[in-house]
Swiss-Prot record:
The modification N6-(pyridoxal phosphate)lysine is found at residue 109. It catalyses: (1S,2R)-1-C-(indol-3-yl)glycerol 3-phosphate + L-serine = D-glyceraldehyde 3-phosphate + L-tryptophan + H2O. Residues 1-23 are annotated as: Disordered. GO terms for cellular component: cytoplasm. The beta subunit is responsible for the synthesis of L-tryptophan from indole and L-serine. HAMAP family: Trp_synth_beta. Its EC number is 4.2.1.20. It comes from the Bacteria. This is Tryptophan synthase beta chain.
Length: 416
């Protein structure tokens, strides 16, 4: 199901997306809806981040670690058998994968965790907290804390801990304390709420490495900027591979960090169609989904105004997805803005469609994608028949599926 797109965005609207207003807003979305206790910490974070980006010692260290520790640049891989699968008599698109699954820790999340850890050190913060759903951001945060000798506490919903037991052990092995959250739905929303409570209590000694382009300003901008290396590399790699920008960008969207990292470098290039794929769960016509943009309304969650899943009284509703990383009733404010001005299109696919796509990609390409990433692959069934032959598609392969094997096996009727 797609959202209705308004007329083509104006140059000014696109420029507004590059950097939010002084009040941290993308259009009407964003802002800082937080306790007064956190305002100095947010101001310090914005100031230190701005200074860091102008400091060559910071950018050089970040670039060096992205290369030698994370393993960047990640390759742009031509998925020939997947492309062949969608070929018709007239031809078909060519499908490329931006291989963020090949990063150290197995997903895009470490780009942001590494950058924020370096910022925390600059601010003199020795204790790090983070929230996690699928566990990938938790693992990435625990990894960089081990690298720099920082205390690490990860908040994770009890349901997600059961779904992602392997990642829970990885975090503990890396020296992190994993704090179970049993409140509410015991998933990502509740883990985020608990992390924010911790931060309010320990703001002087603690830095919160928020894992998505959500939350109060400057986090949506900060997380996006650390992930923008994805799109920067993709733009250059596309020129080398086929001499121009891609026609279509595809990425899954929960909070939206991997999608924003891919989209950011292409926002002002209107020849590039950008599609974010949300989780439709059991179907958007049911109450068990996480299709925030395609089904949500404007509200405030975790410090920012954005599109949310909420009832008529403004109470945030439970989200559902087979993917723990997409199981979130909100979305980053910049995604809400890009949807509102018509620069990006947002669609949704079901659990079943994502599982089918995961199996298809595994068998055709020898790559087992994360369940989150599988949602982006699933949209190819709808997208490809409408495309002209020779269309160049780039899918952000945001993470590998090792963490999801137990979940997938159970759904397919296998005992492990």
């Amino acid at each position: 199901m797609t959202s209705t797109l308004p007329s083509q965005p104006k140059d000014m609207e696109l420029a507004n997306s590059s950097r939010p207003s002084v009040h941290g807003r993308f259009g009407r979305f964003g802002g800082q809806y937080v306790p007064e206790t956190l305002m100095p910490a947010l101001a310090e974070l914005e100031k230190k981040a701005a200074e860091a980006w102008q400091d060559s010692s910071f950018t050089n260290e970040l670039s060096h670690l992205l290369k030698t520790y994370v393993g960047r640049a990640t390759p742009l891989y031509e998925a020939k058998r997947l492309s062949q699968h969608y070929m018709s008599r007239e031809g078909g698109p060519r499908i490329w994968l931006k291989r963020e699954d090949l990063n150290h820790t197995g997903a895009h999340k470490i780009n942001n965790a590494l950058g924020q850890a370096l910022l925390a050190i600059r601010m003199g913060k020795k204790r790090i907290i983070a929230e996690t759903g699928a566990g990938q951001h938790g693992v990435a945060t625990a990894t960089v804390c081990a690298r720099f000798g920082l205390e690490c506490v990860i908040y994770m919903g009890q349901e997600d801990m059961e779904r992602q037991a392997l990642n829970v052990f990885r975090m503990k092995l890396l020296g992190a304390k994993v704090q179970s959250v049993t409140a509410g739905t015991a998933t990502l929303k509740d883990a985020t709420s608990e992390a924010i409570r911790d931060w309010v209590t320990n703001v002087e000694s603690t830095h919160y490495i928020l894992g998505s382009v959500a939350g109060p300003h400057p986090y949506p901008m900060l997380v996006r900027d650390f992930h923008s290396v994805i799109g920067e590399e993709t733009k250059q790699q596309c020129k080398e591979a086929f001499g121009r920008s891609p026609d279509v960008l595809l990425a899954c969207v929960g909070g939206g960090s991997n999608a924003m990292g891919l989209f950011h470098s292409f926002i002002e290039d209107l020849s590039v169609k950008m599609i974010g794929v949300e989780a439709a769960g059991d179907g958007v016509n049911t109450k068990r989904h996480a299709a925030t943009i395609t089904q949500g309304s404007v509200g405030v969650l975790h410090g920012a105004m954005s599109l949310l899943l909420q009832d008529s009284d403004g109470q945030v509703q439970e989200a559902h997805s087979i993917s723990a990383g997409l199981d979130y009733p909100g979305v980053g404010p910049e995604h809400s803005y890009l949807n509102e001005i018509g620069r990006a299109e947002y669609v949704a696919v079901t659990d079943k469609e994502a599982l089918n796509a995961l199996e298809l990609v595994s068998k055709l390409e020898g790559i087992i994608p994360a369940l989150e990433t599988a949602h982006a692959f699933a949209w190819l069934d709808t997208l490809c028949p409408s495309l002209a032959p020779g269309t160049e598609i780039v899918i952000n392969c945001s993470g590998r599926g090792d963490k999801d094997v137990n979940t997938v096996a159970k759904k397919m009727g296998f005992e492990i």
